[in-house]
């Protein structure tokens, strides 16, 4: 048996930067769903899942752009789109044009893990990743020698953990918003470590009442009802009223 060094802590002995507990606000209704203090908390991780075509990328870019417009340093890491694809988004949502974006397709001949490490080391308040599966595949494909998907995911989660703890140049506790795929049955697809590292899990789906956004898990509290939304308005997602979870078909 290998002897493992076990460490226990007492919370009264730990000290954190007060800024860690100040929410990042978009100034819109969705803030109340991310935390009981109305906003996205620093140093957290959120998985985003939902029906195909429901608007996961659009909604999360809208949230990211609103954070950016209120002074947060944000980054979009896209493993799904290229700059031509993104141009179409910007025509409909001009505020997306101001977002710093790392297109992983521009670095397909380089080591993707090192590329992500190099950009994250700057220090960011909030990073949106679309999608975890594509980033994992990119890391696997560009690593010298063989790397399993489990190992690739683990390396990415290690990065999340380091930057959650502000291990970057600006010592910022980074929040990660991670768009994640589900199985054909609609179940969450991911390792136990991924699930445990997620502060919360947000869902978007089509219902007879319209598109909804809700959390099935959120360690930071927040509104438990589902928030209706639509993509009709120009340059912003339209957040509407709420539905109790027992009213959703």
Protein language model features and the residues they cover:
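N-terminal pre-Walker A segment at the start of P-loop NTPase domains
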Residues: 4-34
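Phosphate-binding P-loop
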Residues: 35-43
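Conserved P-loop
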Residues: 42-114
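Short, well-ordered alpha-helix to beta-strand connector turns
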Residues: 43, 71, 124, 198-199
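Short acidic, S/G/P-rich loop/turn micro-motifs used as interaction or catalytic elements
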Residues: 54, 82, 108-109, 133-139, ...
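Conserved beta-strand segments of the P-loop GTPase G domain that flank and frequently precede/overlap
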Residues: 76-78, 102-104, 129-130, 177-181, ...
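Phosphate-binding/switch loop-helix module in NTP-utilizing enzymes
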Residues: 105-173
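Phosphate-binding/switch region of NTP-binding enzymes
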Residues: 158-249
């Amino acid at each position: 048996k290998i002897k493992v060094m076990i460490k226990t802590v007492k919370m009264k002995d730990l000290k954190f930067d007060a800024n860690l507990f100040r929410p990042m606000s978009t100034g819109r209704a969705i803030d109340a769903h991310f935390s009981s203090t109305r906003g996205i908390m620093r140093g957290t991780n959120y998985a985003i899942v939902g029906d195909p075509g429901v608007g996961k990328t659009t909604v999360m870019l809208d949230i990211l752009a609103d954070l950016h417009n209120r002074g947060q340093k944000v980054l979009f890491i896209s493993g799904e789109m290229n700059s031509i694809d993104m141009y179409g988004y910007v025509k409909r949502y001009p505020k997306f044009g101001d977002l710093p974006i790392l297109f992983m397709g521009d670095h397909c001949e380089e080591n993707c893990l090192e590329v992500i490490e190099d950009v994250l080391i700057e220090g960011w308040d909030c990073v949106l990743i679309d999608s975890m599966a594509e980033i994992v595949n990119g890391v696997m494909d560009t690593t010298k020698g063989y790397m399993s998907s489990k190992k690739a995911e683990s390396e990415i989660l290690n990065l999340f953990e380091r930057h959650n703890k502000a291990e970057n140049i600006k010592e910022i506790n980074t929040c990660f918003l991670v768009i994640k795929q589900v199985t054909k049955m609609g179940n969450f697809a991911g390792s136990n470590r991924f699930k445990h590292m997620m502060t919360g899990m947000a869902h978007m789906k089509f219902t007879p009442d319209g598109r909804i956004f809700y959390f099935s898990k959120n360690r930071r509290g927040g509104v438990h009802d589902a928030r209706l939304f639509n993509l009709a308005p120009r340059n912003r997602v339209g957040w509407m009223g709420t539905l109790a979870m027992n009213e959703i078909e």
